[in-house]
Structure formats: C-alpha cells, structure tokens
Amino acid sequence: MAKDSTGRMRVTVKSAGRMKLSSKLWLERQLNDPYVAQAKRDGYRSRAAYKLLEIDDKHHFLKPGASVVDLGAAPGGWSQIAAKRVGATEGKGKVVAIDLLEMPEIVGVTFAQLDFLSPAAPEKLLAMIGGRVDVVMSDMAANTTGHRKTDQLRIVGLVEDAAAFACDVLKPGGTFVAKVFQSGADATLMTQLKRDFASVKHLKPQASRKDSSERYVLALGFRGPETTNWSNPPD
C-alpha cells in the first residue's frame, strides 16, 4: 500500500501472470474507489446507485407511488434505488427493469428481458405496467471502438434512442434521465429534448469519476406525446 495525494492509503496491484496493464489499472481503480466499497456495504449492485441518489436528492422525481422504467438496467443499481424511492418494495409504486441480459431478481422490480429498440417494445411495456409511466431512466453506455468520433456518435445515438422510447411511454409531466458524455455531438439531442420537455439540464454527480467525461441529462416536465417526432429532428 501507498498513500495518495490526499494522504489516504492506496492499494496497488502487482501484475500477476499475463494480466494486461489496462486490467491492472481497472482493478486498482476499483480497489481504491470509495463508492465501490460503500456499494458493497450498502448492498447496492453498482456504484452507479449513488449517482441516481444524488440526482434525485436534488430534483425529487422518484416520488412515492410513481411508475419507473430502467433501460439497460443490469446489474440493477438504479433499479434498487428506484424501487426504494417510489415504494415498490412495499407494493406502492412500480419499477420495470429492461435489459438484453438476464438480471437477478430485485425486490419490488419487474424484470423484462427484451430489446427496447424493438418497434414492439413500447406497447409491451405499456401493457406490462398498465399505462404510461412517470420516469424513464438510462445509465447505459454504448460499446466503444476506440475511435473517438465514432464512439461519441454511438453514445449520443443510444441516448437519442432511449429518449425516443421515453417519449413513447411517458405521461405528460414525466421525467427522462440518461447518461451522456461531454462532447459537441449532443447539440441535436439537447434541442430535441428542449422541444419535448419543459426543463433540460446537464449534471455531473459527485459519484462520477473526476477524470471521466460522463454527464447526465435530466429532462423534466414532458409536454406530451403529441409534441414528439424523433424520426424528424428539428433544425
């Protein structure tokens, strides 16, 4: 162990066998991340839970009795927070977690293994939850190629797809929150969201790593399905 610049003890990993440098650095970061350790103590499936906690503590959209959809939910950290905040663990609100991957059961959460990009997905969700929802959230990140511009476009494209899905299933007044990455590629996304929501802003929770370009977009006050047209973006 060694001390970092703040005086805290830092774990270093000695390379074992054929461990790649990138794997070694990732493991060191995990071992020295206070949010990773706290998530284990609190029983959350990922450190991302604290990002949603912070965003909701400031903006209060996960209200008791609300209905919530978590896109790309695995491993389930955001779904855990949503279930507690809306009362789904006590049979009050509703939380539906959607992912292509299987996800272990979470108390108060209904899991749907499906592709939200499927044309039939919005109708399946509406039938499952019994009507339009209050919140759609996404902590998804697109698979990267290593080519910066291509990756930026992929990331923004995924958020646009999530936003289009949200506009298909949200109630008027509803909320959309999603992970983005700081770049110049999201100008059209922000314009579209501002057309469809009363308030749109970028956020960077303290739980986001300081060296990451990760941000979250929070769109409040959905204007209603009649305003949306994600197949025809505004100029």
Curated annotation (Swiss-Prot):
EC number(s) on file: 2.1.1.166
Q: Which GO terms describe its cellular component?
A: cytoplasm
Name where it mostly resides. Answer: cytoplasm
Looking up InterPro entries in the UniProt record yields: RNA_methyltr_RlmE, RNA_MeTrfase_FtsJ_dom, rRNA-MeTfrase_E, SAM-dependent_MTases_sf
* Residues engaged in binding S-adenosyl-L-methionine: G76, W78, D99, D115, D139
Enumerate the GO terms in the molecular function aspect. Answer: rRNA (uridine-2'-O-)-methyltransferase activity
- Matches recorded under Pfam families: FtsJ
Enumerate the active-site residues: K179
Q: Which reaction does it catalyse?
A: uridine(2552) in 23S rRNA + S-adenosyl-L-methionine = 2'-O-methyluridine(2552) in 23S rRNA + S-adenosyl-L-homocysteine + H(+)
Which compartments does it reside in? Answer: Cytoplasm
Enzyme type, top EC level = transferase
Keywords, A to Z, come to: Cytoplasm, Methyltransferase, rRNA processing, S-adenosyl-L-methionine, Transferase
Superkingdom in the source lineage: Bacteria
CDD domains (UniProt xref): AdoMet_MTases
Task: Write out the function statement from the record.
Answer: Specifically methylates the uridine in position 2552 of 23S rRNA at the 2'-O position of the ribose in the fully assembled 50S ribosomal subunit.
Q: Which family does it belong to?
A: Belongs to the class I-like SAM-binding methyltransferase superfamily. RNA methyltransferase RlmE family.
Name by which UniProt lists this protein: Ribosomal RNA large subunit methyltransferase E
- What species was this sequence derived from? Rhodopseudomonas palustris (strain BisA53)
* Name of the gene: rlmE
